[in-house]
């Protein structure tokens, strides 16, 4: 597989993994998204996504958002330190176009990488 793939070892899979991040997280916040991160012991960054039905009503919008988040992460994973990241969707996220969402995520990945480098 290519180095920009999104394989199983790049995902947060269990509730325990998510709780680990939520307990002591470094945030990067925008009006529509919150990224929470915490250093991990694995050799690469890992991603978890939560987009609640309460925040984004339609399933096809939630799926579109998750696809875009995964693709953006896949493209930026080489520039991220070894951290576990949870992306939390907020209300109004479904109103963003794909391009706007990519732009917001790009800024948040950079912000998160800087904050995690400082806190290390």
Curated annotation (Swiss-Prot):
GO terms for cellular component: ribonuclease P complex. SUPFAM superfamilies: Ribosomal protein S5 domain 2-like. Keywords: Endonuclease, Hydrolase, Nuclease, RNA-binding, tRNA processing. InterPro entries: Ribosomal_Su5_D2-typ_SF, Ribsml_uS5_D2-typ_fold_subgr, RNase_P, RNase_P_CS. It catalyses: Endonucleolytic cleavage of RNA, removing 5'-extranucleotides from tRNA precursor. GO terms for biological process: tRNA 5'-leader removal. The keyword Coiled coil does not apply. GO terms for molecular function: 3'-tRNA processing endoribonuclease activity; ribonuclease P activity; tRNA binding. Disulfide bonds: none annotated. It is an enzyme of class 3 (hydrolase). Its EC number is 3.1.26.5. Pfam families: Ribonuclease_P (PF00825). Belongs to the RnpA family. HAMAP family: RNase_P. RNaseP catalyzes the removal of the 5'-leader sequence from pre-tRNA to produce the mature 5'-terminus. It can also cleave other RNA substrates such as 4.5S RNA. The protein component plays an auxiliary but essential role in vivo by binding to the 5'-leader sequence and broadening the substrate specificity of the ribozyme. Consists of a catalytic RNA component (M1 or rnpB) and a protein subunit. This is Ribonuclease P protein component. The gene is rnpA.
